[in-house]
């Protein structure tokens, strides 16, 4: 799980490298965001086949085809609305149709899993364990707060601090360092003491503290100041990710460890998808308020007045669209470009670009505040979640012992 958590943060770094490259092996750089999974997947499959040798007793099983179909009906519409809701409108006909279809799919999936019983894709008996249920809820909440808030950071680094995608990726390294450190330390303590409940509470507490710290982010924030918040977030995630899965794994019978692990990961990823969709929507929708408010700030107005008296600024064609919008009193079109392409800010006179930077930073602060509040809920739930004792035997060993009797 520490590997997964670290990979979640390394992803934007590597993705930034690909996005910033014009071509790699004669293929557009951004396409490697998808293509990189092919060689990695092939290596992973080779290692599994070569090194993972688990004793297997053939048994007759029935594949839960109905569960597989209904979970697709449930999940795909929700993913579509999460991806397109900001463009469609969250209350549009298309979005409502996706909500309804997804809701019907969830009901059908539950009915299918009840009928499949122990052969179910997701055995509902797992939720009889209060710990598993609480760990699942925690996973969803943490996924929302983790991915939703974390995906905002690279945008702020690029738009407000002027970093390229590649630079923004490397600027996330403090979070990676915090995560790896916390993962190693908490993992060692857990393996030596068998106790991990404290990390279920400390983890989200540090995560919330990191978001709380980042609510002080502004257009004047220095990178070293932002990196403190990243380290706190990394320290929180490094402790939390693996312990949530440990709680889920140790709350179910040994024979169900695999499906419990997969389920915990699935629900966390769904929470992350929801978090990214909602928080990015909040970020860009907030710009309609924060950018006009930034134009009214005294320091911004002073800079604008000085720039408008500068002949070089007035004659620069890069400033023409801004000046036209300012003259008409409608900056909406230019502000709207931040949704798709913020590169125009790099060519504007810094005094003209400042209200956009201030407004974007203020919108990001709103996201961090909401993400922190979401994670605070996780802290409360974690306090009341029971942490089962760690197993002393693997599932294979337990099965062998049961067969011996």
Named regions from a protein language model:
Residues 1-67, 93, 177:
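Helix-loop-helix hairpins in multi-pass membrane proteins, especially solute transporters
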Residues 1-14, 20, 149, 155, ...:
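Small-residue-rich alpha-helical segments with characteristic i,i+4
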Residues 9, 13, 72, 180-181, ...:
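Hydrophobic/small/kink-forming positions within alpha-helical transmembrane segments
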Residues 16-29, 85-89, 159, 191-192, ...:
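Extracellular/lumenal inter-transmembrane loop segments of multi-pass membrane transporters
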Residues 32-48, 70-74, 97-105, 366-383:
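Symmetry-related core transmembrane helices of the 12-TM Major Facilitator Superfamily/SLC fold
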Residues 38-39, 66, 80, 88-259, ...:
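Transmembrane core module of solute transporters
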Residues 42-50, 107-111, 212-215, 281, ...:
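Membrane-embedded alpha-helical segments of multi-pass transporters/permeases
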Residues 43, 47, 53, 111, ...:
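Transmembrane-helix exit segments and adjacent C-terminal regions of multi-pass membrane proteins
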């Amino acid at each position: 799980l520490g590997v997964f958590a670290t990979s979640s943060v390394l992803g934007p770094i590597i993705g930034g490298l690909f996005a910033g490259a014009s071509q790699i092996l004669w293929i557009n750089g951004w396409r490697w965001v998808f293509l990189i999974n092919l060689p990695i997947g092939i290596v992973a499959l080779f290692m599994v086949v070569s090194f993972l040798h688990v004793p297997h007793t053939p048994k007759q099983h029935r594949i839960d085809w109905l569960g597989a179909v209904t979970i697709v009906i449930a999940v795909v519409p929700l993913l579509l609305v999460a991806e397109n809701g900001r463009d469609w409108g969250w209350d549009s006909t298309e979005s409502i149709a996706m909500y309804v279809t997804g809701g019907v799919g969830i009901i059908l999936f539950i009915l299918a899993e009840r009928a499949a019983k122990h052969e179910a894709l997701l055995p509902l008996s797992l939720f009889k364990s209060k710990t598993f249920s609480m760990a699942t809820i925690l996973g969803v909440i943490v996924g929302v707060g983790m991915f939703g808030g974390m995906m905002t950071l690279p945008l702020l680094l690029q738009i407000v601090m002027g970093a390229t995608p590649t630079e923004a990726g490397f600027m996330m390294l403090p979070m990676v360092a915090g995560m790896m450190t916390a993962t190693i330390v908490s993992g060692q303590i857990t393996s030596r003491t068998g106790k991990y409940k404290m990390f279920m509470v400390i983890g989200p507490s540090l995560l919330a503290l990191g978001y709380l710290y980042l609510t002080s982010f502004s257009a004047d924030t220095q990178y070293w100041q932002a990196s403190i918040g990243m380290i706190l977030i990394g320290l929180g995630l490094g402790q939390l990710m693996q312990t949530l899965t440990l709680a889920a794994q140790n709350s179910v019978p040994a024979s169900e460890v695999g499906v419990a692990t997969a389920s915990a990961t699935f629900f966390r990823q769904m929470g992350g998808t929801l978090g990214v969709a909602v928080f990015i929507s909040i970020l860009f929708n907030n710009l309609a308020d924060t950018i006009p408010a930034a134009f009214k700030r005294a320091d911004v107005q002073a800079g604008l007045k000085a720039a408008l008296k500068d002949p070089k600024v007035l004659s620069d064609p890069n400033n023409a669209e801004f000046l036209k919008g300012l003259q008409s009193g409608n900056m909406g079109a230019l502000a709207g470009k931040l949704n798709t392409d913020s590169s125009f800010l790099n060519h504007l006179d810094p005094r003209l670009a400042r209200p956009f930077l201030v407004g974007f930073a203020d919108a990001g602060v709103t996201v961090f505040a909401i993400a922190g509040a979401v994670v605070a809920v996780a802290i409360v739930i974690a306090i009341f979640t029971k942490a089962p004792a760690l197993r002393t035997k693997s599932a294979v060993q337990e099965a062998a012992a049961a067969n011996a009797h």
